[in-house]
Amino acid sequence: VLLSEQSRKGVLVRIEKGAYYRPKKSVLGLGKLPVYQDEQFRYLTEKLNGYITGAYVYNKMGLTEQVATTITIATPNPVRRFRFRNLDIECVKAYCTDYPDDSLVPYLRLLDAIKDMKHIPGTTGQDIYNRVKSQYFNGYSLPELEKIVSLAKSYPPRVRKVVADILG
């Protein structure tokens, strides 16, 4: 009740049911600043205990030029598709659930790209294979490659096979 009263007064802004934040004032003294997409992503990934993957990340990695309309989050316990603010959110199963910090997330995203190789829009599986091999695997050091191999053990056999072929 107190939070909703403060929300009506403008002291707090409601994100969703039970979640509020205190808006920052801009330099010009204007009211609320817009909530940026990165802040929304951070909030969702912390709430769902996962990391962002899918077509949105594959676009950022340079694997496709298509822009994603749905944001995919890999979580240990997927929930059904929902809408948050102006974003469509889809949750998929995370194959590696016990990563201690966010330093492993780029490797997990790379393994997700290998897993979804045939389903990445606007490109072929062979093209993705060549890009992943040239852009990522050739630039990694031996300890990084060992991390990728250890993380790949929790992925399906097709991912392990592609990683073995690349490292060949």
What are these regions (language model features)?
Residues Y95-G168:
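Hydrophobic alpha-helical interaction segments
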Residues G31-V35, T53-Y56, I166:
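Short N-terminal helix-initiation segments at or just after the protein's N-terminus
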Residues R85-A94, D98:
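A short, charged helix-loop
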